Amino acid sequence: MTNIKQTIREICFNSHLLKKIYCKISFIKGKVECRKSLVEPILKYKKSVEKPVFLIFTPEHANLGDHAIAFSEQIMLGEISVDYFEITGKKLYILDYFGYLNILNGFLILINGGGNLGMLWPDIEKMNRRIIESNPDSTIFILPNSIYYEKSKQGIEELEKSKIIYNSHKSLYLYAREKLSYDFMKSIYENVKLVPDMVLNLNEVKEDYIKRSGCLICLRSDIEKTLSIEEEKEVLHYINKVFGANFKYSDTVLEHDISTKERKTELDKKFDEFRSAQLIVTDRLHGMIFAAITGTNCIVLDSRSPKLKGCFQWISDLGYIRFIDDLSAFETECRILLSNKKNKFDNSKFTKYFDSLKKDILQEFKD
C-alpha cells in the first residue's frame, strides 16, 4: 500500500496540475485530521468549563528548562484553582497552518514563559505576533520572559513590527524575568511587570538525599554558546585538578523530544542527577537555576547572554551559587564551594512576585 501511494505521489509531482490537486487533497486531509485531533477537544473543553483558560506554546521539544517553566506554571495554576487547557507549540503551529488560531479568541490566554521574545528565536516571536493578532478579544499574558533584539537594520525593523502588533492589542500583559529585559520591555510595551523565572517558584531540595559525588558539567552547544574550545579545555583542566576523573557531562537539553506526559518524569530524573553531584559547572540559565532549587553547589561561567547574569541577580545571595567572569578564579571558587555541606534554598523572597502574577491571572479569570 505504501508503494502504491508513493507511485501516485511521484506521478502527481511530474505534472504541475496534478501536483496542485495532490497538494490540495493533502491539505484538506490534514485539516480534517487537525479538526478531529485538536479543534474538537478544544471546543469540548470550552463547553465544559465556565471560564476557559489556555496555557499555550508549552514545549514538546528536548529542552528541560522550558519544560520546568511549563511545569511550574501548571503548579501555579493548580494553586489558584484555574482549570486550563494546554496547547503545545507543536500543536499551535498546526492550528495556525490550518487557520484555527482564532479558536482561542475571547478567552484568557497564557503564553509560556522563557527566553524567546525578540529575534534570538525569530520563529517564536513571529508566532507570538500571530497569536496576538488572531485573538483581539482575548486577555493575553506573556509569562516571565527575556527579550533580545540585535541593533542591526533587521533587528530594528523586526522590533518595530512587534511594537505595532503588541501595542495594538487592548488587553496584553507582559512579564519580564530579569531587570535588563524589564527595562527594555517597559520602554517599548505597555503593561509590563517584573517576575522571576517561573522555575524559581519550585523547591527541589531533599534533606535525606543520597551522598553527593563528583562534578557535573552542563555547557551549551546551541546558538547561544559563548565558550570557545580553548576556554572549555581550560575549564576541564581545573575540574581535573580538583576532581580527577570523577566528573561527567550532562545537559538540560536531552537527545530526544519530551511529551507533556513525560515532562515530570524527565524533570525528576534531571533533578536527581543534579542532587547527586558535589558541583555543577554550567553556562546554561537553567543549569544554574536547577542547581539553585536542588541546593547544589554551582559555578556559573559568564556568558554574553544578558539573561544569565540578569537572572543570577535573583539568587546572588545564595552562597552555593558563584558567578565567575574570569576562569583563573575557577579553582579557588571550586574549593570554597566544596566546603559547603548542606545547602538550603529559600525562595520565600520571590513569593510577592509570584503572588502578584497569580492575582493578575485571577482578576482576569473572575471578570
Provide a role label for each language-model segment.
Residues 2-367:
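Active-site anion-handling motifs in enzyme catalytic cores
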